Amino acid sequence: MKSVLGFKKAKVTQEKISMVTCYDYTLAKIINSTDIDCILVGDSGGMVLLGKKNTTYTTLDDMQFMTQAVANGATDKFIVADLPFMSYRQSLETTMQAVMALIQSGAHAIKLEGSSGNLDIIKHIVDSGVPIMGHIGMTPQFINSFGGFKVQGRTEEAAKHLLEEAKLLEQAGCFGIVLECIPANIAKDITQNLDIPTIGIGAGSNTDGQILVLQDMLGMNTDFQPKFVKKYIDGSKLFSDAINTYVKETKANTFPTKEHCYDYC
């Protein structure tokens, strides 16, 4: 997938869209060689890569650094970058400066969270030539309002509000919407009522696509195992075993061997 046109086509043809997060050059190069459709440089990188408490601590400088790294490694992939916490809530000028910074760092599109107070901003960004992806449901930047990472849309009123939000984001010009941690039947209803694709994370299988944090699906974080994550490998054990083998071989002087040494001329 090279552009937003790919998202539109996927919605029409009902081809599922695959997305993962990425925050660094090395993993971006690996992803670039895969069949993945799109990469999200998420503000979650502040937590996953930098060890911050939650995404409200991720800065624009962090996002620029990670976006540049991913863009350098994944040269053939469509890249979406998150606008970090409060970067689009201060003024239109600071919002557009943040958008420009991420696009000039290598992103092809921008994602922001929520609808309330964002619709005019989204329209302005889209009118400026920058594609926007929306994000509703459990929006991590609102963690302090939610009282933690909690499933959203579990009441009839909340479900109705989510559908209204999704339609407003579509009308504002979003080319796609992330649905995070909402009941599967609600996600299905939203998906069927939009002409733009939905990307689910903890939203069931009836969205137009899926996204996971790369380190989660690779089993690299043993402390974070939410219900919606499938571990495709036990990355934590894989890496730990490899490092411990290296340590043992070093102490036993079985590494390096001749094949790893340079000969005299």
Curated annotation (Swiss-Prot):
GO biological process: pantothenate biosynthetic process
EC number(s) reported in the record: 2.1.2.11
Binding residues annotated for 3-methyl-2-oxobutanoate, in chain numbering: 43-44, 82, 111
Keywords from the UniProt entry: Cytoplasm, Magnesium, Metal-binding, Pantothenate biosynthesis, Transferase
Reaction catalyzed: 3-methyl-2-oxobutanoate + (6R)-5,10-methylene-5,6,7,8-tetrahydrofolate + H2O = 2-dehydropantoate + (6S)-5,6,7,8-tetrahydrofolate
Summary of subunit composition and partner proteins: Homodecamer; pentamer of dimers.
Keyword Magnesium: yes
Organism (species): Francisella tularensis subsp. holarctica (strain LVS)
GO molecular function: 3-methyl-2-oxobutanoate hydroxymethyltransferase activity; magnesium ion binding
SUPFAM superfamilies: Phosphoenolpyruvate/pyruvate domain (SSF51621)
Binding site for Mg(2+): 43, 82, 113
Pathway(s) this gene product operates in, as recorded in its UniProt entry: Cofactor biosynthesis; (R)-pantothenate biosynthesis; (R)-pantoate from 3-methyl-2-oxobutanoate: step 1/2
Cofactor(s) demanded: Mg(2+)
Protein name: 3-methyl-2-oxobutanoate hydroxymethyltransferase
Entry's localization field: Cytoplasm
List of catalytic residues: 180 (proton acceptor)
InterPro entries on file: Pantoate_hydroxy_MeTrfase (IPR003700), Pyrv/PenolPyrv_kinase-like_dom (IPR015813), Pyrv_kinase-like_dom_sf (IPR040442)
Highest taxon listed in the record's lineage: Bacteria
CDD domains: KPHMT-like (cd06557)
UniProt-listed Pfam families: Pantoate_transf
Known function: Catalyzes the reversible reaction in which hydroxymethyl group from 5,10-methylenetetrahydrofolate is transferred onto alpha-ketoisovalerate to form ketopantoate.
Entry's cofactor comment: Binds 1 Mg(2+) ion per subunit.
